[in-house]
Amino acid sequence: MGRHNENIGHQARKRFGQNFLHDQGVIDRIVRSINPKSDQNLVEIGPGLGALTEELLKSGGSVTAVELDRDLTPILRTKFFNYPQFNVIEADALKFDFTQLATPERPMRLIGNLPYNISTPLIFHLLTFRGLVQDMYFMLQKEVVDRLAAKPGEDAYGRLGVMAQYYCKVESLFNVGPGAFQPAPKVWSAIVRLTPYTEPPLACKDVATLTTVVRQAFAMRRKTLRNTLKQLITVDALQSLDIDPQIRPERLGLPEFVRIADYVYDHPLENES
Ligand SMILES: C[S@@+](CC[C@H](N)C(=O)[O-])C[C@H]1O[C@@H](n2cnc3c(N)ncnc32)[C@H](O)[C@@H]1O
């Protein structure tokens, strides 16, 4: 414990969501899960002071790190100057165009102990590059991992889980307590693995329509489908799809959402805005 982040004099910045990992056991466990190989294209988001980066570099793979805090990039360059396969880019990962870091032939393995305040929009941003991604390993607030991996009927089930599971196989790997970080966050964290499908197993006709249906359905999660989806689909149409209009959205699985989205795409209601 405490091996990293010492003697560097960097004050953790709350606005950048800086909670630095300092538990070597947790770092090793994450890297063992990733199992990086020397010919791989590893991309780390938010390397911080390089606790994970160092172990990734030891695998021999190339590591490109995307870090927003301009005070950290020189520290990282100095720390890893012995590793020619290390590169740090000073950029906001939320706006960064990841197409410059990978090709379909050399996809990225995305890794990050992500800033918790931006993790949901960042995951949606990263999903847009899924064709260039082999897999993703993220440390997130446990509550967000629960939402990503949630199944129908669970409290955590909602838009994030449905859309992530549409594009990716989602696996919650293990939990990490606050004491593994400096400063310690207030909440528990967890590691999630997202593996994008080459082709979604339940492909819908139009993802924009699926997104609209899912967003609308969960906008009022305590209401029944006949209410939440009334601007998109009629009760008769829901019944024709073998979906009970009286149930709440949290009971619908991905196949039902895809069925509704395909119907809505083929039969747009006139009052749809
Ligand atoms: C939770 S810390 C993790 C640091 C390090 N990976 C570790 O495990 O100790 C999050 C890191 O993401 C960086 N960060 C915050 N917002 C960012 C953004 N929009 N784009 C890229 N990096 C960001 C922070 O400066 C910080 O280094």
From Swiss-Prot:
It is found in: Cytoplasm. It catalyses: adenosine(1518)/adenosine(1519) in 16S rRNA + 4 S-adenosyl-L-methionine = N(6)-dimethyladenosine(1518)/N(6)-dimethyladenosine(1519) in 16S rRNA + 4 S-adenosyl-L-homocysteine + 4 H(+). Pfam families: RrnaAD. S-adenosyl-L-methionine binds at N19, L21, G46, E67, D92, N113. SUPFAM superfamilies: S-adenosyl-L-methionine-dependent methyltransferases (SSF53335). GO terms for cellular component: cytosol. Signal peptide: none annotated. Keywords: Cytoplasm, Methyltransferase, RNA-binding, rRNA processing, S-adenosyl-L-methionine, Transferase. Belongs to the class I-like SAM-binding methyltransferase superfamily. rRNA adenine N(6)-methyltransferase family. RsmA subfamily. NCBIfam families: ksgA. This is Ribosomal RNA small subunit methyltransferase A. It comes from Hahella chejuensis (strain KCTC 2396). The lineage of its organism: Bacteria, Pseudomonadati, Pseudomonadota, Gammaproteobacteria, Oceanospirillales.
